[in-house]
Amino acid sequence: MDRYAFLSFYKCTHQVGKFVGSDTWSNVLRESWFFNNWKELLVPVSLSTFLLLGLKGYLDEQFCQVEDLQDEASPNFVEEVVTLFFKDSGRLMSNIEQALEKYPRDFNRWDTYMQQLKGSCSSIGASRMKNECMSFRDSCGQGNVEGCMRSFQKVKREHAVLRQKLESYFQLLRQAGPAGAATRPVM
């Protein structure tokens, strides 16, 4: 039991919302219903799933698919993949930065580098970063230097935020030990 965090389910707010009304009885019903049914509204989830909720919007379903590849034979698989992503993405961002300085208005070159970075983002499910890469590529297609520069700054910012969030995520999983392994419950 200690390996599970408990998370209130959407059903709670949905059911309680059914009883909202203007008179006192609706308040009594709402409170009574919740008091008598709260145990049914809790869903056990693994620690990793619970922690991933903090990364919602930064990661998409692809990250969960990467997690599904992790097993007892390779217990650090996801962390290793993410480490490789940050190493590779750092190199690609350095290449983009150099290209922006060395080759002003070479939109094809910029776009090629950003396409590689976007592919890396897609492979681990880094959705916010991928979206900023797409914005950069759109600006390249429009020949918009300022748009490219703005988008690249956003890419760098999203990269830094994602790195910090994932480092915290893996640190918490390591502290929890094997019990916090990235497994999702069968529903």
UniProtKB/Swiss-Prot annotation:
- HPt domain span: 74-169
| Effect of gene knockout | Dwarf, narrow leaf and small grain phenotypes.
Q: Does the keyword Repressor apply?
A: no
Q: Which GO terms describe its cellular component?
A: cytoplasm; nucleus
Q: Which UniProt keywords apply?
A: Cytokinin signaling pathway, Two-component regulatory system
| Function field | Functions as a two-component phosphorelay mediator between cytokinin sensor histidine kinases and response regulators (B-type ARRs). Plays an important role in propagating cytokinin signal transduction.
Spell out the protein name for this chain: Pseudo histidine-containing phosphotransfer protein 1
The gene behind this protein is PHP1
